[in-house]
């Protein structure tokens, strides 16, 4: 449908033109006001408090400007021109006006809650935040603030449901939730366990938290409640085991690591795990498996070519003088304190040229003191040869390292060249 007018007189045309100008000016003014209020309300734009107050006075019906002013006051909590109480009251008034102007905006309800808490009105703070949660029930940030407010006001029981919701929706917040509840309840583990939810990996987060409190038995129990499949997949598993090791909890670390690695189709009850290099190391889970690192003197890799199995450790020298190997190949063991053990392995050199070949050594895990070592790998024949080490585990240090060790006797030695294969490491009690 088309509507048209015929303006025959000059007066009517002038009147119409004037009305159009007024309408355009009004629309332009509205757009200008919208632009200015959006700029003033932008949190990324640095505007001092005085200017915000002037803007709020000039645009009294702008919810955005009112909210920005209230937010600024809540954040600063300090104004040289007025007391804390007066500032809190003013912030509350502006936040309340923002809610009145835009009642469907949950963020303004959150702001009103903060302003109410700032002036000591806990009931209004809780009421406003509950309304925000009603408007945005799936907003994790709102639920997190609800949980914190309830905890601050002593409503621990009510806060647990909120903390649990947040932990399930955003697992990254679980460590903070555990810390807050730990402090609020004086370390009541029964309370902390109620926020873990159904995610098995939450048990690993909980276990890591407990290691930080030096509650290693409780941490081990929490760790064990997470099924093996999830443990093998989660990077948290390695962090928990590392925390046990860092605290010298060798026995717990060994027990939990073996329980994790001994899946239904892969069991290894030997004192020295993976002695024949048949199991592929898992990233982050090599605490009691082989640690291999190249250096400037040699490269180490597990590949096909084993003595009794499919694979072996290949050590290839780079032909650099004064060759030194200390921790490039090592394996952590937890053993019985004071007990005597015999370590054996096989080595096969290929075109090995050296002043003195490497040895198999057993060192303390804490001080790296050498407890015993084998004879050097012989260059006499390119065949598998047996290396053996007898040693006693220190009573005060049940954790030891098996290493491939080559220390030059002099400040300069001729380059070591060639390759050595290592395989079939075994450990037995004497």
Feature annotation, model-predicted:
Residues 57-61, 103, 137, 168-172, ...:
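Short coil turns that delineate tetratricopeptide repeat
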């Amino acid at each position: 449908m088309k509507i048209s007018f015929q303006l025959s007189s000059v007066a009517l045309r002038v009147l119409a033109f004037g009305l159009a100008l007024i309408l355009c000016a009004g629309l332009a003014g509205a757009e200008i006001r919208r632009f200015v209020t959006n700029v003033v309300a932008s949190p990324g734009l640095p505007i001092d408090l005085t200017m915000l107050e002037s803007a709020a006075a000039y645009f009294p019906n702008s919810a955005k400007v009112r909210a920005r002013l209230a937010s600024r006051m809540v954040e600063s909590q300090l104004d040289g021109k007025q007391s804390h109480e007066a500032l809190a009251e003013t912030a509350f008034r502006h936040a309340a006006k923002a809610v009145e102007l835009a009642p469907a905006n949950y963020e303004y309800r959150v702001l009103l809650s903060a302003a109410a808490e700032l002036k000591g009105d806990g009931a209004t703070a809780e009421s406003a935040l509950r309304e925000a949660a009603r408007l945005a029930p799936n907003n994790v940030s709102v639920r997190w603030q609800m949980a914190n407010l309830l905890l601050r006001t002593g409503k621990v029981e009510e806060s647990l449901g909120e903390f649990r919701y947040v932990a399930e929706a955003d697992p990254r917040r679980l460590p903070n939730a555990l810390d807050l509840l730990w402090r609020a309840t004086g370390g009541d583990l029964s309370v902390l366990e109620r926020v873990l939810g159904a995610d098995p990996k939450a048990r690993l987060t909980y276990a890591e938290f407990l290691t930080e409190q030096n509650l290693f038995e409780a941490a081990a129990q929490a760790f064990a409640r997470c099924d093996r499949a999830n443990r093998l997949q989660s990077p948290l598993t390695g962090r928990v085991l590392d925390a046990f090791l860092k605290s010298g909890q060798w026995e717990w670390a060994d027990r939990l690591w073996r329980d994790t690695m001994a899946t239904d189709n892969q069991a290894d009850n030997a004192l020295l795990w993976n002695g024949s290099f048949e199991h592929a190391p898992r990233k982050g889970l090599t605490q009691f498996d082989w640690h291999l690192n190249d250096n400037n003197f040699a490269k180490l890799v597990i590949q096909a070519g084993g003595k009794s199995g499919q694979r072996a450790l290949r050590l290839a020298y780079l032909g650099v003088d004064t060759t030194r190997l200390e921790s490039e190949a090592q394996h952590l063991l937890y053993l019985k304190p004071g007990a005597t053990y015999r370590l054996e392995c096989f080595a096969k050199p290929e075109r090995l040229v050296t002043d003195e070949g490497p040895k198999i050594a057993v060192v303390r895990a804490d001080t790296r003191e050498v407890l015993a070592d084998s004879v050097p790998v012989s260059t006499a024949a390119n065949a598998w040869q047996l290396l053996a080490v007898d040693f006693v585990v220190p009573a005060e240090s049940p954790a030891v390292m098996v290493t491939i060790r080559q220390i030059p006797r002099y400040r300069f030695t001729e380059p070591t060249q060639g390759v050595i294969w290592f395989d079939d490491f075994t450990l037995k009690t004497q």
